[in-house]
Amino acid sequence: MKLIRPSFEILEQKPRAIVIPADMEIGPRMVREELLSSVYRQIEIAGRTCYKSEDKITDTSAKEFVERMVKSGHGAMLEHGTVYLLLNMASRQQYFKYCSNPYSVANSTGEAEKGTWLGFVTTNYRVLVENNWLDDLQYICEPGKEHEKRITVKFVCDRGVSHEFVRHRVFSF
């Protein structure tokens, strides 16, 4: 019998540092692409850990891995890709669909009447895929203090503990 030493590891989802020469500005498209890449990388880490294929992770494998998960309908892995959205007055109508989504958290500040309204949505990639809301990725942003923060944690435990752990719906992965 092999004894398992229980442990955990917090898997942070964060964009790679983009090195920008001092005389150059980074465009918003490049920022959005890197934020989306960080979502893909997080999904790949969760998926490859689950499938015991971590050795296949490369610098360029994440997007292809996520596309395969979407195509094959393996939505559980997509839940690990946290998406933070920032909505303004022009995109305000998008906000309300997240208010009624049980897997999203929507907060707002300011007042619509004064034109100072901002919406802060925390959701996951599975919500966007299953509801056909991928167009909303144009609003992707880094998490701000108004966003609900999410983390992914890798637990190492024995089989008996894992069966108890996943009996709760929020932990059924």
Enumerate the predicted regions with their spans.
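A conserved ligand/cofactor-binding region detector
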Residues: M1-F173
